[in-house]
A protein has these predicted regions:
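Conserved N-proximal alpha/beta basic substrate-recognition cap immediately N-terminal to
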Residues: 1-50
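Short acidic-hydrophobic, aromatic-tinged amphipathic segments that line or gate anion-handling sites
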Residues: 51-56, 85-88
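Conserved protein kinase catalytic/activation segment
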Residues: 181-183
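Short amphipathic alpha-helix with an adjacent loop that forms part of the alpha/beta core around
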Residues: 60-66, 95
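ATP-grasp fold ATP-binding core
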Residues: 41, 65-82, 102-112, 130-134
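A short linear hydrophobic-aromatic micro-motif
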Residues: 50, 70-72, 103-106, 170-172, ...
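Non-catalytic, C-terminal membrane-associated alpha-helical segments of glycosyltransferases
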Residues: 24, 235-251
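ATP-dependent carboxylate/phosphate-activation module, predominantly the ATP-grasp catalytic core
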Residues: 91, 97-98, 106-170, 177, ...
Length: 251
């Protein structure tokens, strides 16, 4: 909701000399509505998990063998993990829809999830930085333990679809990986809750923001970080390298 307000007043901010590092109204609306985003991605040939909105449409696909249980359901316009469930049977799925607690979408269940923080330059509209990490543990909708990795296939995938949107500044993306290909699940047009992992690994979006504020176009430096850097979130945050963690363990 806050992003919609900012995006709707994009030009007003610019008129008073404020740099609105937020998406356009159209892009913000797509990111907020997960089913609209799914349709948009499919129409443009972008890999994304098979998704249904209507229960009858899911049933038709299920009985044709196009999708299997388990599936994953979540609110069409939800955030975090509120209302999100793994569902193993048709009866359970029907019960969730009958309760009508949320306007659900049904998504094929995929494993191999990871995410990426990216920065889109305000002036060039190019992706100038990407930091990718695999999730080790997730709590309350956000990753609490992650490890950094690099994969040129993921970097290329992100760059292949970014022209379809109008972003500026930091974004957070969720992906799945299956059979050698990445699938885009969601885009949050804001700092991700686990951005501190990227920052701790040396990916400083704040420098990029300051450059844009000063009218400077940022250079593209994608994947400019170390692999094997862990973020371990407890009551506090620990950022370390995998090799150092193993060394401490063996010592």
């Amino acid at each position: 909701p806050e992003l919609d307000l900012l995006a709707s007043n994009h030009k007003k901010f610019e008129e008073i000399g404020v740099l609105p590092l937020c998406p356009s109204k159209q892009t913000a609306d797509l990111c907020f509505d997960k089913y609209s985003m799914y349709l948009y991605l499919k129409n443009h040939g972008v890999n994304t998990p098979l998704t249904f909105h209507e229960l009858d449409d899911f049933k038709a696909a299920y009985f044709k063998g196009e999708i299997q249980f388990p599936v994953f359901i979540k609110p069409r316009t939800g955030s975090g993990s509120v209302g999100a469930h793994k569902v193993n049977t048709m009866q359970d799925l029907e019960n969730y829809y009958a309760e009508n607690a949320f306007d659900y979408i049904i998504q094929e269940f995929m494993q191999g999830d990871c995410d990426a923080d990216a920065y889109i330059d305000y002036y060039s509209k190019e992706v100038v930085s990407i930091f990718s990490k695999k999730k080790i543990e997730t709590r309350i909708g956000g990753a609490s333990k992650t490890i950094s990795f690099k994969d040129q296939r993921l970097f290329d995938f992100v760059q292949s679809f970014m022209h379809l949107f109008d972003f500026a500044g930091a974004i957070d993306m969720d992906f799945f990986f299956r059979d050698g290909e990445y699938y885009l699940s969601e885009i949050n047009p804001r700092f991700g809750g686990a951005y501190l992992h990227a920052y701790g690994a040396g990916v400083d979006f704040f420098k990029l923001i300051i450059n844009n504020i000063n009218g400077v176009t940022n250079e593209v430096r994608i994947g400019d970080y170390d692999e094997g850097v862990l973020m371990l979130m407890y009551d506090d945050v620990v950022i370390t390298k995998e090799v150092d963690l193993l060394r401490d363990y063996h010592d």
